[in-house]
């Protein structure tokens, strides 16, 4: 969960008009309209913590590597980070492991949010169990409309500064790159080939914890990246596309 919003008035000059329609990416990881769940249903989910407080979500790729979003790891040192795995609660239970290092995608651009992916290396190995499991990386993007789920400890309402203690999830449907960039939605050319979208029909839900998992067909298909807020039906949640960034993750894990 990233507790800030990039405001138009603050950064319009810096972006130099790269974002059309006068809108800027809003990084406000949250699960709105979600349901409490247990870690056994999402055993790859971790809480990325900065100085002991939850800051982002992530997914277990191997027993020593976590996949998360690059925007979660800006202006932070590895020594201040740890992860909690194997617990439905971000503040207790399971196991905590210190972060030894991390690497952001070299092509990550905070203005366009392209290549918004990173790998975290742990100081010791996770012991796999029914509540701590790795998840495979998608090798191709799911079809438009495919069922998916997103999980995390994001704030449950727009503008809220508090987060739930228990893991939340929401069911969504994939919106393909081409569909998300089409006139059916409002993003247009902001959707790049390293992104995939998802939306929840009939719910006020768009995205979960920043850096957290979007899962479809039992594999990791997306990493929660950005969006224009859950109130707008023509702006789905936007995720880093794992299929398009798979090679980078494998080569840098």
UniProtKB/Swiss-Prot annotation:
Disulfide bonds join 56-72, 180-197, 206-230. It comes from the Eukaryota. Residues 31-253 form the Peptidase S1 domain. GO terms for biological process: proteolysis. It is found in: Secreted, Extracellular space. Gene3D superfamilies: Trypsin-like serine proteases (2.40.10.10). Residues 1-22 form the signal peptide. The keyword Magnesium does not apply. The active site is at residues 71, 116, 210. It catalyses: Preferential cleavage: Arg-|-Xaa, Lys-|-Xaa. Keywords: Disulfide bond, Hydrolase, Protease, Secreted, Serine protease, Signal, Zymogen. GO terms for molecular function: serine-type endopeptidase activity. Its main location: secreted. The record marks 204 as: Required for specificity. Belongs to the peptidase S1 family. PANTHER family: AT26814P-RELATED (PTHR24276:SF91), POLYSERASE-RELATED (PTHR24276). This is Trypsin beta. It comes from Drosophila erecta (Fruit fly).
